[in-house]
Amino acid sequence: MNLAGVDTGSLTPREKKDWSAWVSELLAPCPSEPVSIAQCVREARKCAKCLPAANLLVKQVRAGKSRSQAEDAFFARFSTDRVKSIDVGDSPSKGSSSAAVTIVEWADFECPHCRHAAPVLEKAVENHPGKVRLVYKFYPLQAHVHGESAARAAVAAMKQGKFWEMHHALFEHQEAMEPRDIEKYAKDIGVDFAKWKADWESEATADRVNRDRKQGDAVKVSGTPTVYVNGREYDLTKFDMEDDLEDWIKLDVELATGQPADSPRNEGAVPAASSKTKPPGPNQR
């Protein structure tokens, strides 16, 4: 089987046979088009998700995924019942508040996988100016001794408009998070130290961190980082933070605006923050 816009040239005969079966048997990801993915693409039905779905399944079969794994990825990406409403409230953010794509991340400053994800997510905002917004939510894990203290430090810095400066300092110096270390970072980023320290130790700041944690619990956050893109979980057990995120964002921009997404301004892989190895997945509670 050949479908316009789908490159299957790199597939082996067995892989192409599997892919052909999948796109012939799985329904198009638009309820208004109750036909197979293959028929949807072939007949150019009015479902902008069909061609991306067919291409997603190419990536899945090329990666050696089973039928079950490929279907899980397909439904995670396209099922209409997977989208949740997430209130960003006063959470710190980067990018336009009217961006077509909003990325919400629950993270822990002591989590190595979060440290790895941070520059990748920020790069997405830089690569798509005005189209992507990144929102940070606090979710310190009980297993991390300094996670709660670091989250409070970032909230206290946020109150002085210095959240992202503290965010960067904490991830850059993740191995040094004793109170004296965090106090040094606060001084380095130029906050009013007395006010910052009072806020760092206040109940109001602890409540602010706990509010994000409760919101995370409500959407079943079980580890960090947990990432949602336009209300849909970007499941890091199924999708790679670097290899798949750009395609995901481009499609969401196109679906939201009806216009092709611009190519990123800067090509190339995004380096992990001071990390030589790529972590396998999110930290669990």
Which role fits each region the language model picked out?
Residues 48-49, 106-107, 113-125, 183-285:
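C-terminal cap of thioredoxin/glutaredoxin-like
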Residues 86-101, 126:
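A short beta-strand-turn-helix
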Residues 118-139:
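Conserved helix-turn-beta segment immediately C-terminal to the redox Cys motif
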Residues 25-41, 109-113:
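Local cysteine-cluster metal-coordination motifs and their immediate loop/turn environment
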Residues 13-28:
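Immediate flanking context of iron-sulfur cluster ligation sites
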Residues 154-176, 190-197, 204, 210:
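Short, internal strand/loop/helix patches
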Residues 99-102, 129-133, 160-165, 191-194, ...:
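Loop/turn elements at helix/coil->beta-strand transitions in domains of secreted/extracellular proteins
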Residues 1-2, 17-18, 34-82, 264-285:
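N-terminal targeting signals for export/organelle localization
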